Amino acid sequence: VPLSPDLFSLQGLRNLGPRLRQWRTEWEERLTKNPEPSLKLPSGRMQPTGYIMMQHAMRLDRPVKAYERWIACIPEIYRNYVLDEPGGQRLSVANDPHRLALLKHYQSLMPLAQESHKPMFQLKPADGAGGAHIQAVRNVYRDFKELATELARRTGIALPQPD
């Protein structure tokens, strides 16, 4: 689940969890009413894998105070509403086992990537990613590789090994 530290993401989580549970119940009913037994239907046991938190711009290596309040609410709201687990110990996003990644605000790389029609981690100097952007592109590549690796691990998908 992609999230930003804002009210819209919190409200989205509050809506998503109950809707997923309703969808599973409705799907179970549909499975029993399958008119064609030879038609193999998925079990419908979709489970959330976690959430990805997008940081807003940092100030002195920490989020702006207004965003910190929203960020602090995410782990509990995710656990309570999406996973339907009762509140337990209060976790920070940094220590939450359900957090897949905490992606930084890559500032000017996003518009460069959009203009170049390519992912941020494939930007080259010819795309305008020169100077300090070169290190930022490397950081984006590392961050997305870590995210892909974690997603694959949690979902049991084998990643291709580099040659």
Residue ranges and their predicted role:
Residues L31-D163:
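C-terminal lobe/tail of nucleotide-utilizing enzymes
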